Amino acid sequence: MQDLHIHMFPGRMDTPDVFKQKTLAAGVTGGNVLGMYPETFGKEEGEDQRWGARLDAVLDFCGGAPGFQPFFWIDPLAEDALEQVRCATEKGVAGFKVICNYFYPKEGLKTYQAIAETGLPLMFHSGVLYNEQPSSGYNQPMSFEFLMDVKGLRFSLAHISWPWCAELVSLFGKLNYLDECAPEGRSQMYYDITPGTPPIFREEALRRIYMTGLRVKHRVLWGTDCIANDYNVEYARFWADMDRKIYDGISADPNRYRVAGQDEYDYSNIWDLATDGNFAAFYGKK
């Protein structure tokens, strides 16, 4: 099982070896580690938040944790954002991370285009943003609709965009349709189902993803939102156990809402795909 969504936060950090021991205890053998955030997201006293230092930190950490991929957190509006993309790519990151905390997504278009040209994936936050600013409105799903025209970009929207889960599903429907019509000229959108949905909303959100009638089987990625500093084994197990039961229910009755005339859905292996099989395509390693 892989975990798409693991953060590096300020403060004490487990060694890569201890981190690996904890992830293995949770049944997680690999995934993504998202590097420390820039000052424009939050200034941390005593932390070196210069982009070069943050880049080296996530590369060094993942270098000691085989199976885990380094993702660089970039502010797409930084004056030297394109230089950051170039340098991070040359140094070997596996992808990029963006949270739109003070800007609308479209303002970073040039940076996203540069990332698309590298062939590396881009992970976005989506949904309510728990910080000290009124910033959630920057992260509603339809604010990302323009990405449909960023040729070659593979991107994910996190947390099922809670509380705008239905809006996210409708956005995926549009982008999925366009990608099927012109696969060489459009972007590819993935669901990052990392919690953000509280447990009481979780089953409904996952059922909407799979049972709306869209081709989602190969576009869903599972994560926890744990931190690499001290990976929470109990928390990761909780979400894996809950989600596995929900997935079993979906697989047992996949055609409940199938429209007459549509092909029957085969959701027999959706859990294995979301927790492992879909990762390689997201990374660009088909």
Where are these regions (language model features)?
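A general structural detector for well-ordered alpha-helical segments in enzyme core domains, enriched
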Residues: V18-K22, R54-F61, Q84-A88, T111, ...
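Short loop/turn segments at strand-loop or loop-helix junctions that form parts
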Residues: V33-P38, F124-G127, D225
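H/E-rich (His + Asp/Glu) clusters that bind or coordinate divalent metals
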Residues: M13, S156, I160-K286
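Short, flexible/disordered intra-domain loops and linkers
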Residues: P38-G52, Y130-Y138, E167-S170, R202, ...
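Divalent metal-binding pocket/active-site signature
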Residues: P76-E79, E90-Y177
